């Protein structure tokens, strides 16, 4: 039995210099698993609770010593001696121990750190790479990356209201060529921005954060970068947006402050539809406020057959909310963020539910990241098909891309790359 003999939680820093939780799980054999959890900036109101200390004398109140203490005392007492290979049982133990619907007592940052560290230890004990431990022999599909090359909204201090402008190298034959494509576009964009006298500083997720006058102007510049890098937009590369619309929704209107617009739900759907008509946009995330289900129904009716409509704040990786969305025909894709729900077992359940309903699943990082690359292994192990893990800069983002390169190398000839075919529920 892969018995857990020790568990250690600690406070470490994420990519924004804020505290987060790391956990080590030691097995009877001497094998250790280590994991660190991410943290978001734009968060859904129904996400599992990230436990912070609130002590303003430490890290401006953002310390996580309470969550760490919960690992080292209460969680340790409950899982020491358990079999690390029984992931579902261990995760259920954590859920029951917490006793709330949103991990508010122990903290999702505590439960997730333990859940991930247990999986890493069990994979090491079994002599398996993590992606193989997650997916068995069936995990062989590399994901199409959504590469965030321009940051706006809550991820950057600029005039862009839309939070992320991304490129998706769908025309590549394999993941390594897709990564090269994204990197070449990123560097071409840097050259173009510099020539226009715009800053080339980067935001939280590694994308540039220039002050474009409009979303349209930003997309035009990205199109130039794609062409300048030697690729054809619409064939080799498609575009994706993360509106994070909950961040600029107020009093029933969508306030695009950068463009001086105040739009109703229907008008904002049309605004996004017009952008999709002018540019090769294949995916729009959080195009409506998380509670604007009428707006979501409208945008799904208008765009859902040709555009991937991803629910992030809408679904928060929660099967109960996703089930309701599926029943009402809201969106056609879910963003998967492991810290939104707080255990691996619940994460995998959300991915499986989405697939059964013909929704796509996009595995995602958070804006506050660490060097932990577990989401890369999840993307391959579950054959998710897409991953969103930032730009082509900042080592906290590159760590995931590099892990995917290693996995592709490990898989060898059996590795597949879906490209456009991952948008199996669209008619384009």
Curated annotation (Swiss-Prot):
Cellular component GO terms held in the UniProt record: cell surface; extracellular region; phosphopyruvate hydratase complex
EC number: 4.2.1.11
Cofactor(s) listed: Mg(2+)
GO biological process: glycolytic process
Protein family per UniProt: Belongs to the enolase family.
Binding site for Mg(2+): 242, 285, 312
Known function: Catalyzes the reversible conversion of 2-phosphoglycerate (2-PG) into phosphoenolpyruvate (PEP). It is essential for the degradation of carbohydrates via glycolysis.
Metabolic or biological pathway, per its Swiss-Prot or TrEMBL entry: Carbohydrate degradation; glycolysis; pyruvate from D-glyceraldehyde 3-phosphate: step 4/5
Keywords, sorted A to Z: Cytoplasm, Glycolysis, Lyase, Magnesium, Metal-binding, Secreted
Active-site annotation: 205 (proton donor), 337 (proton acceptor)
Free-text comment on the cofactor: Binds a second Mg(2+) ion via substrate during catalysis.
Record-linked PROSITE patterns: ENOLASE
Species of origin: Polynucleobacter necessarius subsp. necessarius (strain STIR1)
Enzymatic reactions: (2R)-2-phosphoglycerate = phosphoenolpyruvate + H2O
Location in the cell: Cytoplasm; Secreted; Cell surface
Top-tier EC class: lyase
Protein name: Enolase
């Amino acid at each position: 039995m892969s018995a857990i003999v020790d568990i250690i939680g600690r406070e470490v820093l994420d990519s924004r210099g804020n505290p987060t939780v790391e956990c080590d799980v030691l097995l009877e054999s001497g094998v250790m698993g280590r994991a660190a959890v991410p943290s978001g900036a734009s968060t859904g109101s129904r996400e599992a609770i990230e436990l912070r200390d609130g002590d303003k004398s430490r890290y401006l109140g953002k310390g996580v010593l309470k969550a760490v203490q919960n690992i080292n005392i209460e969680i340790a007492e409950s899982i020491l001696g358990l079999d690390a290979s029984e992931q579902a049982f261990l995760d259920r133990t954590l859920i029951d121990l917490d006793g709330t619907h949103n991990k508010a007592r122990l903290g999702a940052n505590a439960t997730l750190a333990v859940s991930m560290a247990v999986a890493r230890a069990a994979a090491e004990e079994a002599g398996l790479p993590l992606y193989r431990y997650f997916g068995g022999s069936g995990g062989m599909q590399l994901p199409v990356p959504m590469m965030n090359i321009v940051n706006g909204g809550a991820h950057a201090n600029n005039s862009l209201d839309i939070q992320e402008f991304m490129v998706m190298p769908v025309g590549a034959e394999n993941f390594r060529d897709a990564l090269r494509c994204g990197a070449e576009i990123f560097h071409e964009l840097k050259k173009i921005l510099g020539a226009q006298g715009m800053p080339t500083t980067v935001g939280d997720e590694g994308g540039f954060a220039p002050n474009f006058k409009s979303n349209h102007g930003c997309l035009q510049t990205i199109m130039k970068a794609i062409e300048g890098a030697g690729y054809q937009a619409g064939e080799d590369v498609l575009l994706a947006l993360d509106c994070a619309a909950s961040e600029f929704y107020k009093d029933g209107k969508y306030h695009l402050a950068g463009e001086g617009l105040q739009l109703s739900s229907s008008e904002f759907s049309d605004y996004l539809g017009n952008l999709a008509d002018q540019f090769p946009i294949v995916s729009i995330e959080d195009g409506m406020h998380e509670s604007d289900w009428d707006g979501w129904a409208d945008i799904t009716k208008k765009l859902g057959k040709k555009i991937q409509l991803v629910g992030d704040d809408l679904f928060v990786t929660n099967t109960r909310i996703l089930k309701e969305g599926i029943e009402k025909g809201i969106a056609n894709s879910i963003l998967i963020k492991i810290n939104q729900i707080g255990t691996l077992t619940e994460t995998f359940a959300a991915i499986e539910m989405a697939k059964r309903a013909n929704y796509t699943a996009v595995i995602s990082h958070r804006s506050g990241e660490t060097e932990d690359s577990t989401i890369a292994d999840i993307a391959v192990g579950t054959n998710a098909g897409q991953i969103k893990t930032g730009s082509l800069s900042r080592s906290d983002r590159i760590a995931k891309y590099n892990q995917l390169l290693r996995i592709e190398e490990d898989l060898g000839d059996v590795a597949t790359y879906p490209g456009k075919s991952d948008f199996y529920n669209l008619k384009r």
